[in-house]
Amino acid sequence: MAFTGKYETESEKNYDEFMKRLGLSSDRIEKGRNFKVISEIQQDGQNFTWSQHYPGGHSISNNFTIGKETEMETVGNKKFKVTVKMEGGKVVVDSANYHHTVEIVDGKLVEVSTFGGVIYERVSKKVA
């Protein structure tokens, strides 16, 4: 499937400001800076398992089906309900305060998140 694979962070834009906006502590932000987040995605049709592995052994795994409401968790351990959509080949998570898009561009996973007016971008290369 289009998204299935294991990806490692290659570049980030606006990391510190975005993580502060999410409410992460300075210590946690420091630990995560320049860390190569590993994203593992399994896609089976409209069903996804999306796991991200962070510094210190912290991992988040979200399961969702395109078009169905689900509860998701953020890196800041905040949970929210959302209906994940697929728009023009992009996975889109859109709630009152958070907007996130993910797409494959030239074989790379490109994620753009907006929270509280702050935009963060992470580009990851496929490693498996």
Curated annotation (Swiss-Prot):
Keyword line: Acetylation, Cytoplasm, Lipid-binding, Membrane, Transport
Membrane topology (UniProt): Peripheral membrane protein
Listed GO CC annotations: cytosol; membrane; nucleus
Compartment(s) where it occurs, according to its Swiss-Prot or TrEMBL record: Cytoplasm; Membrane
InterPro entries per record: Calycin, Fatty_acid-bd, ILBP
Pfam families the UniProt entry points to: Lipocalin_7
Modified residues (N-acetylalanine): A2
Coiled-coil blocks: none
The keyword Lipid biosynthesis belongs to this UniProt entry's keyword annotation: no
One Gene Ontology term from the biological process aspect of the record: fatty acid transport
Its job: Binds to bile acids and is involved in enterohepatic bile acid metabolism. Required for efficient apical to basolateral transport of conjugated bile acids in ileal enterocytes. Stimulates gastric acid and pepsinogen secretion.
This protein's domain notes: Forms a beta-barrel structure that accommodates hydrophobic ligands in its interior. Can bind at least two ligands per molecule, however, the stoichiometry is debated.
The family this protein is said to belong to: Belongs to the calycin superfamily. Fatty-acid binding protein (FABP) family.
Stated name of the protein: Gastrotropin
Protein's organism: Bos taurus
Lineage of source species: Eukaryota, Metazoa, Chordata, Craniata, Vertebrata
